[in-house]
Amino acid sequence: MRRAIVRGTGHYLPERVVENSWFEDKLDTSDEWIRARTGIERRHFAAEDQRTSDLGILAAQAALADAGLEAAQIDAVIVATSTPDLTFPSVATMVQAGLGMRHGFAYDLQAVCAGFVYALANADALIRAGLADRVLLIGAETFSRIMDWTDRGTCVLFGDGAGAVVLEAAEGQGSSADRGILATDLNSDGQYRDLLYVDGGVASTGTAGHLRMQGNLVFRHAVEKLADTAHRALDRAGLTPDQVDWLVPHQANLRIIEATAKRMHLPMEKVVLTVADHGNTSAASIPLALSVANAEGRFKPGDLLVAEAIGGGLAWGSVVLRW
């Protein structure tokens, strides 16, 4: 059976690094307060002339180089983002053009912080169905553009960046020993839409708006739902948490990550962590973490990975894949 295996990874982080201390003369906060509650120490902000597509193109180029492929060998581009350059056309078509591609298809996918997990499931389905042999997946965000800089409960959390993964079709035996994506689990529940949202939009206010969040409630849902979705995906793959080599979580908050790992009975030594250096980069966080860990040589062939995320909607999900 056809499997979607990881051929390459790449990422890009803007040059501007913002330490927690930057917020101290703007808000009633401190480096110690932010670290204690989130685990975040710094984050990157895009330059004024950088758009989400610019970040995505640079991450895509890095992933293609890691895969040893040219853009002409890619069949589809999927970009997960909540901060597009424009209402339309899609960021994906801008990346497609930026890479010099004149073929294939490209589209955006919006599931906020869960976006890259949804994108992985989309790409897996395309490859399994024979609609594409190679898919370039990108998570790219410029959340600094939608921050309310007077709200210390949100503006200290987020950063900008992009990560990319090249998935490629390969033949497997149809067993849990195969390389590639083995199972996915996607969920959403719109009754919780007011827990995490942006208070602007084309059809409502005609403005970009600012991010709003009921942090305590989001935290509770995240701790419950992330471990549950990971367990469901593992069960679908015929696997158990004790077989997991690496948990690659959405990098929202260290306390959420620790609680999820505890519920899965995984030691923190098996968890990929980038939240301290990147902050919450929404849909970019999982591909950023994958790329950083891959560049460090942490993943070995045959390693079993679980990626999970939750975001506005609420939308959440997980992917089980073998490296």
Curated annotation (Swiss-Prot):
Compartment(s) where it occurs, according to its Swiss-Prot or TrEMBL record: Cytoplasm
Gene3D superfamilies recorded: 3.40.47.10
Signal peptide location: none
Domain of life: Bacteria
Pathway assignment: Lipid metabolism; fatty acid biosynthesis
Enzyme class: transferase
InterPro entries according to UniProt: ACP_syn_III_C, ACP_syn_III_N, FabH, Thiolase-like
EC number: 2.3.1.180
Span list, region ACP-binding: 251-255
Catalytic reaction annotation: malonyl-[ACP] + acetyl-CoA + H(+) = 3-oxobutanoyl-[ACP] + CO2 + CoA
Pfam families xrefs: ACP_syn_III, ACP_syn_III_C
A GO BP entry: secondary metabolite biosynthetic process
Keywords: Acyltransferase, Cytoplasm, Fatty acid biosynthesis, Fatty acid metabolism, Lipid biosynthesis, Lipid metabolism, Multifunctional enzyme, Transferase
Catalytic residues (UniProt): 113, 250, 280
GO molecular function annotation: 3-oxoacyl-[acyl-carrier-protein] synthase activity; beta-ketoacyl-acyl-carrier-protein synthase III activity
GO CC annotation terms, alphabetical: cytoplasm
Domain writeup: The last Arg residue of the ACP-binding site is essential for the weak association between ACP/AcpP and FabH.
Role: Catalyzes the condensation reaction of fatty acid synthesis by the addition to an acyl acceptor of two carbons from malonyl-ACP. Catalyzes the first condensation reaction which initiates fatty acid synthesis and may therefore play a role in governing the total rate of fatty acid production. Possesses both acetoacetyl-ACP synthase and acetyl transacylase activities. Its substrate specificity determines the biosynthesis of branched-chain and/or straight-chain of fatty acids.
Subunit structure, interactors included: Homodimer.
Family: Belongs to the thiolase-like superfamily. FabH family.
Designated name of the protein: Beta-ketoacyl-[acyl-carrier-protein] synthase III
Gene coding for it: fabH
